[in-house]
From Swiss-Prot:
It is an enzyme of class 3 (hydrolase). The lineage of its organism: Eukaryota, Metazoa, Ecdysozoa, Nematoda, Chromadorea. It holds the Pfam family Peptidase_C48. It comes from the Eukaryota. It comes from Caenorhabditis elegans. GO terms for biological process: adherens junction maintenance; protein desumoylation; proteolysis; regulation of cell-cell adhesion involved in gastrulation. Residues 538-800 are annotated as: Protease. This is Ubiquitin-like protease 2.
Amino acid sequence: MSDSTQMEANAAINEIKKRTRKLDQSLQMRFCADQFFIGNHCTKLASGKSIIISQNSKNRICLRFFMAADPLVGYTGRDFGIAFNQIDHISLKDEQQENPAVLICTLNLSSYTKMCKLQTGLKDVVEKPFLYNKSLARNLTFILKPWNDDPDTFVKISYNDEHREYVHSYDYDVAKSLMFKEVQAVWEQSLKEQLQRRHQTGRVYLTSQLSEMTPREWVQFLADQKLSKIVCHNGSIQYARVEDNPHGRKHTAVATNGFDHRGTRVLNSFGKAHASLATQEKSYAKKRKLTEQSLKLIYRNDRSVWLEGSCAKNLKMPKINSEPNMGEFMGWPDMDNAMTHPTSNFENEDVMKSTKQPNDFVSFEQLQAPPPVLQRQNGAIYSTQSVAFTHISGNDGVEDLTEKISHLGEEAYNIDMANALHAFSDNWHYEIHPNTVHNASFEQLHIGDGNSSIGTIGFNPLEPYPQSSFPQSNNWQQAHGDFTFPQVSFPNTQQGSCLPSTPTAALPPTRPVVEKIPPDTQLFTFPPSGSCTTGMDPVVLLVKDIKTLDRKEFLNDSVMAFMLNYIAFMLSSELMKSVHMCNTFLFVNLTRLLPPLCFSKRRPIEPEHIKIVKDNCPRVLRWTRKFDVLAKDYIIIPINEDLHWLVIAVINPSGAIVDMSNEEASRAAPKCYIVFFDPLSGLDPSKKNHMCHCIKIYLAQLYENTKAPGMKFASKNPTIYDEERVVVTRAENTPIQDNFYDCGLYVLHFIEGLFCYPNRPVNVNDFPNFDWSKFFPEANKMCDLMRDKVYNLILQQADKPARSRLAKFERENKCGLSREGALRKARRHSAVNERRTKRHRDYYARHYSLSPPHRNVMNDDPTFMNPRGLAEMPITRLVRRLRIPEDNFPIAY
């Protein structure tokens, strides 16, 4: 082949590649984002812009999105195009009932750094919530939504052919299939070529860069990213960042050997800047432990004010007179002249409990240093300057001496101790004299070798002590000149450490700050990991959810969802396959924009109302599109409307389907029953008619979209849906609540009673004349104990740290059933006879018992008639026996 022919062939190949590349670049996958998070910072995409996956000009597959202007991260929008080679991992999450679909991209470090450089302020805003794991800030989370009301429009595939653009819409399953089959193959090939260009030899094993996220992994991802789910008024789901907890950082406890329980410890940290003292440590946890233990001021204001009596290990102190007693107060200005300074002995009384007289003050020039045997505590050496007391005589008695110095401990809180403290290393040198005199305007606190400092505010005393020579002057520096500072030495402090200037904190409190448990603290996730949970979404229980189990409180949806999962989890595997537990959002989304009680049969049913329900059906049908719901024997639908819990059980939903190939036998089979359970049972059927009619429309739409001929779960034989075979009923003699706040507990009893009967579950053969009292004769008593039962089940599922957090939260907020039980224990220890064993301190005396009153006396109004009392009235029983049509009765409530 001649050279000219070869050149023509290469030109033709290049032209084909160019056209192919151009055609490939026109192929795009477009997603519509409802929310966009960088880390856990919520921002927005530009108006009208979407998420695009396509090939760039270099024929590399890339992710492209246009970020809108955000005042926190830059006032200008920016178009980002990130090649897949710069992405570590991509996760896809399908819709799970009310939870939307999600696309998560984890950037590698280089692409994240470039993105932060392009967008001013992005790094500071995104990394601020993730001090311990900044890699979480590299997650791009896109909350997806359909392009329109049709749920099958999650992704748009567009391409150009002969200068014409074609656009097709598909559901999320098609988008996921394209990502795993097409995009992943191109992505892996691109990574292999990149490794070959870098001349890396040997076989390369590439791990999967694309994965599907399970519901449990999504719950854990939200917890790691500090995001919380918010249910909007229209039933949609939004996500928001959890507010930063002011008590989130836990202080490192300081050892208290030698302290009694009456002492009060106050720990003050110098701030975040003190972390620079431990920059040589490899672990952040080690840095934090070192800095928190070494840079905290410890104040004592009780009888145990003196530190533990032990000298520095390798430091020989000269003896003065004899071994000092516990009440001996002594000191010296330096090592050479230690014997020339007098000492004073006094009784170590509680100096804070004496009454301080007005105008009492002691000058720091007149204070004597504490004894050396009281210098070391928790590895820190404390020393103060030595100035003799002018108002204390060695001949004074204990009472006189105590009266004279009783103001010292209290007066120490009238100044900022940080202004009078010098910190130096454990092995301080003798040439650094403790009696070094500083000017009164001294504004630095020295650390380590004395060359490093942090800024403080000058000392400003209140008023002079009456017996001292301290002159009364507003300017203490002019009147008194120089004064000395007490000194504090911290061990293991790095030499030459430097801390920035910080303003002096407020006066130290008299008791340590107690860290409270925030209400959003997570307890556990149910069902447990590793269990077979097909069709069961995990539920995260928070501390605030358990508070709804208190007396006279309404159960929230989290506790209800936990119990639904628990009941389903405890069923046998065969029975579980025939049960579908809907979540509490199904009926809310099904009746969105629907007028209240429009199907109550008290007014004509309008076609537009039926159309509203049918339009809402695709939203909830997406949640169960992966399995055949009508093939189940039980469909449990919990409902919360107007702060009231109800439940509807669809028994034998396939009974509404007629097999036309054997119509006679099919119509002779058991029908479909919609059983309505209302613990606030009255004579008015309006709510029952309205809710059950909505469920009938839902079942009809469910058949048309899943079981009709040509659908995904259609039968081989021709079938039709017969609405006449759907019977609305209610069980007889069901328990009725005797208050207006236990409705959720009764609903749990109804759901549990359908499956947990000792002999067998309730089946379709028990209807329509099903008597609940025959199965559960003591149903009312069982419902009254349901609150304690749910609480105990939660404690069983929680581990020990979770139970500890819950108990602490209940003590802080004075709530919880466990607190009520602890208070009732006092009655067990109220025996008349003398005790042989000492009463435990957790048990209170009888007159301190706060047990709640009996249920019969809890009603404020003695004439109050509860729902159960109304249903048990003789006139009510007579009306029910007459079986007068319910539609003729007026509204009872």
